[in-house]
Amino acid sequence: MSGLPLISRRRLLTAMALSPLLWQMNTAHAAAIDPNRIVALEWLPVELLLALGIVPYGVADTINYRLWVSEPPLPDSVIDVGLRTEPNLELLTEMKPSFMVWSAGYGPSPEMLARIAPGRGFNFSDGKQPLAMARKSLTEMADLLNLQSAAETHLAQYEDFIRSMKPRFVKRGARPLLLTTLIDPRHMLVFGPNSLFQEILDEYGIPNAWQGETNFWGSTAVSIDRLAAYKDVDVLCFDHDNSKDMDALMATPLWQAMPFVRAGRFQRVPAVWFYGATLSAMHFVRVLDNAIGGKA
């Protein structure tokens, strides 16, 4: 990331949900937690709450949530509590949440947050299988809130949905798929074998075109010219209200010369949160189906 321009680094850091630590805090029990007053300081626990049928009382950085995540949508009633890295502690104190949830290792220290309300961090990944960790985190949150049946129902629906969509991709063959999102007109984020999407690709027999380096979260930033090496691939690029940058890139001779562009195998698709959990994975499958489902 150090090689990116400052504006690119800022844009990428805005998108990333860093959660490398395993430290967790659990100082409240379900009986003491009002489910109508739970604040989520990061977008992973937002998704976990929504999967359990709980609308957060407050969420950090709702504007960027709607750009980068979009699904599941946030109701207008949700209060924006500031940045994910620096939430508004004064506002949080005034809101008197019954509980706060965040991504472990991201944002203010748990000790600082404990002065406002009890809370706990949840993990996005173990660096290898994000969806397996997502299911584990969902179960942990359900245990905390005494919503085990809701978690079981959601996970069963998730498995049924993933399985039901598999026939949509059986005719596709072995052409690899490159998953990307634009950071700026010169750099893209690409997603590798330890990303949220890999388990879905494996289930559907779709090879991941990116087998290069990745970070803990399953992604890496690359210069646009590195994509010229990819020839017989499909390429999907997740939008996030970045049409100006996309238009600038697509007007360049370098981009127009890309083999997958000339072959008509590049598509811009709706935003999917690549550091999410099961709801993001289901949204990804719907986006994937609209783009390449039922096609050879």
Swiss-Prot record:
The record marks E86, N88, E90, H187, S223, R226 as: Interaction with FhuB. Changing W68L: Decreases binding of coprogen. Does not bind aerobactin and ferrichrome. Increases resistance to albomycin. SUPFAM superfamilies: Helical backbone' metal receptor. GO terms for biological process: ferric-hydroxamate import into cell; iron ion import across plasma membrane. InterPro entries: ABC_transptr_periplasmic_BD, Bact_iron-sidero_bind. It is found in: Periplasm. This is Iron(3+)-hydroxamate-binding protein FhuD. It comes from Escherichia coli (strain K12). The lineage of its organism: Bacteria, Pseudomonadati, Pseudomonadota, Gammaproteobacteria, Enterobacterales. The gene is fhuD.
